[in-house]
Amino acid sequence: MFTLISSPLGSVERLIIQKQNGAELEILTGWGAGLNAWRIPTEKSTLNLLYGYQTEESFWKIQNDTSAGVRLAPWAGRTNNAIWNWKGETFKLDNNVSWAKHALHGLVHQKKWLLKSFTSNNEKAILTLAYDWTGNHDGFPFPFHAETIFTFTGHSFSVKTKTTNTGSKEMPYSEGFHPYFSLGEKIDNLTLKIPVSEKVLVDSTDIPTGMRETETRFNDSLLGDTFINDCFAIQNLVEKSETILKSSSATLSVWQNSNAKEYRFIQIYTAPDRESIAIEPMTHEPDVLNHHRELTVLQPGETLELEWGASVAIHQ
């Protein structure tokens, strides 16, 4: 069985789904529906497979730079110079980082999400959170209703998202998630395998140029000191694409539904301290609100459903 525990991180609302064997999935409902921890009991200790915030002090100190675990919508990644265009209109967003002039990660990643439901049985627990974007913002005047549905079994979780255009006009839309994964040791010691992909080429400000090149580096390859901060376009658009991270003691599979209009891209980022790696499912390249390549457009009343997740196997 599973228990839902309310355990605020200081002033930030936090829920923990706890399995009877001690496995836990921790979600910051008060901050972007963010995945904050995934703890698995092993023979020797407890393994936390997600980088997150341990104290309120560390949260407020680094959350704006890391955005760890949060849902990214109605765009993911960078919007160039915090300006975008749609049907002849220009919209101005907030430049929300100090190190670039862009707008990053959408509009819901720092919002409080509401608990809609929680159910569980012997096999799994399902937590549903909801958020309504009213459209009362000159930078994105398109209202939508969003739900994030977490299903947790202990050694796996999935995240299903639903987004409904609640306005009267067509709505451009893009989405991603921003989890940082860890296997309890430096990522230098891990191997990485990604789906067959093309690397998205970017300019000096990390905005896609429209060009891509075949990616061949990551096929069960040792990470070593490799720095990655790249977006990859998945080439075989199938129901599930897998990114696999391995250590000597565990294998982590991060999967994403990658059919047309789903998570067709992955952003991968190696954290500077080499303790974690962001593996981010994305529907589009960064800056899609400007370049419009394969842009998703939701009609009034239309709902988009997406899904990704992760599972771990422990080698005893």
Where are these regions (language model features)?
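Extended, loop-rich substrate-binding clefts of extracytoplasmic carbohydrate-active enzymes
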Residues: 1-9, 85, 89, 94-153
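Beta-strand-rich interaction surfaces with strong enrichment in secreted/lumenal proteins
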Residues: 147-149, 293-298
